[in-house]
């Protein structure tokens, strides 16, 4: 099923998505990679607030290349999501609506997705230049000292993703293999 979803994502939208759905996202998403996740965890451990609101928001695991003149961002392909698996359950418990990355997730992350009615999307690896064309604005909003791993606020329009793990725990990486083996 092809769906158009506004982000931040509404709970009813997240709950209605199924593994394998093709989705385009329009609105605001945030980027964060390993170093930013580590710093957010340190802030939480110290009893500090996070630099971005989690409720309903979407984090894209991505660190862009430098922007060409006249563009808001350079190549913007996904990074391997499993590197954030130690941090994702806590952020999901704080209300994170969805994550975008590539690759498999740990069982702890899948359990947190189900527990919180969230979703994990995949973006196409190797298509960063094409994906960047769907990013209309980019602004560093936290951890500027981390360079490419700083947290960015992105305005996206018709940003293409696929639901890999839905709010019921259905996992496209597992079901696709079973379907192929028939």
Describe these PLM feature segments.
Residues 1-9:
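Short, structured beta-strand/loop micro-motifs enriched in basic residues and often containing a Trp
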Residues 31-32, 36-159:
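Feature captures the catalytic cores and cofactor-binding loops of soluble hydro-lyases/lyases
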Residues 88, 164-182:
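Active-site/ligand-binding-proximal alpha/beta "capping" segment
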């Amino acid at each position: 099923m092809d769906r158009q979803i506004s982000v931040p994502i509404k709970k009813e939208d997240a709950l209605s998505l199924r593994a394998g759905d093709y989705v385009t996202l329009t609105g605001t998403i945030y980027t964060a990679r390993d170093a930013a996740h580590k710093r957010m965890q340190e802030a939480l451990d110290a009893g500090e607030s996070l630099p971005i609101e989690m409720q309903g928001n979407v984090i894209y695991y991505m660190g862009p290349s430098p922007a060409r003149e006249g563009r808001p961002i350079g190549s913007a392909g996904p990074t391997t999501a499993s590197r954030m698996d130690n941090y994702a359950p806590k952020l999901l418990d704080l209300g994170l609506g969805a994550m975008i990355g590539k690759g498999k997730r740990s069982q702890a992350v899948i359990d947190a997705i189900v527990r919180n009615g969230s979703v994990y999307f995949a973006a196409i690896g190797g298509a960063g230049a094409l994906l960047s064309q769907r990013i209309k604005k980019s602004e560093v909003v936290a951890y500027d000292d981390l360079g490419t791993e700083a947290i960015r606020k992105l305005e996206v329009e018709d940003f293409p993703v696929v639901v890999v793990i839905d709010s019921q725990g259905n996992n496209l990486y597992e079901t696709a293999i079973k379907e192929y083996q028939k």
